[in-house]
């Protein structure tokens, strides 16, 4: 039994040592230059140096990251296609029931990579200087304020 276990461990470590034997693609579901893209490229550079192998980012922007997630879900499960995603992946699963993939079934999270802040910003000359003032303004002028977001349902 011990010999079989040792043999199995040696075979596994041999297979592990050979990965990656070819370039690794990281799918990013947002445009080049976005914060997700920038962090993804830093990660690709570091993984490439660590593995001594080419690791590149492929941007598949659109549909709040769902185009890239769908491509990752349909890629072979060989480790040569990775998805760099953010919280939109979980939000999409809850908000969009007819996605062409099932994140829980088709994808597997392997590591948290970065934490980025989400901040609310207004133009410098906008009268509201805090959230309470912004809420008061929105209530006093229903339907007059707009916002921009890269998220689901934007």
Regions found by a protein language model. Name each.
Residues 26-40, 61-63, 149-154:
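Extracytoplasmic "Venus flytrap"
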Residues 1-7:
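Sec-dependent signal peptide recognition
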Residues 36-52:
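Short, polar/charged alpha-helical segment
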Residues 13-17:
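Sec/Tat signal peptide C-region and signal peptidase I cleavage site
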Residues 24-26, 33, 40, 57, ...:
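Residue-level signal for nonpolar/aromatic packing positions in well-ordered secondary structure
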Residues 22-31, 55-56, 81-82, 108, ...:
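Short, well-ordered beta-strand elements
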Residues 74-79, 94-154:
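Hinge/capping helix and adjacent helix->loop/strand transition within the periplasmic-binding protein
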């Amino acid at each position: 039994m011990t010999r079989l276990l040792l043999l199995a461990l040696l075979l596994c470590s041999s297979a592990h040592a050979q990965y990656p034997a070819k370039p690794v693609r990281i799918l990013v579901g947002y445009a080049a230059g976005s914060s997700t893209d920038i962090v993804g490229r830093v990660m690709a550079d570091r993984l490439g140096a660590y593995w001594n192998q080419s690791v590149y980012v492929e941007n598949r922007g659109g549909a709040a990251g769902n185009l890239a997630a769908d491509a990752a879900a349909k890629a072979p499960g060989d480790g040569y296609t990775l998805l760099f995603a953010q919280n939109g992946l979980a939000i999409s699963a809850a908000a969009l029931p007819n996605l062409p993939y099932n994140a829980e079934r088709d994808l597997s999270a392997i590591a948290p990579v970065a934490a980025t802040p989400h901040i609310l910003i207004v133009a410098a000359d906008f009268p509201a200087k805090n959230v309470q003032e912004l809420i008061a303004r929105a209530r006093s002028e229903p339907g007059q304020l707009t916002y921009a977001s890269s998220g689901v349902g934007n």
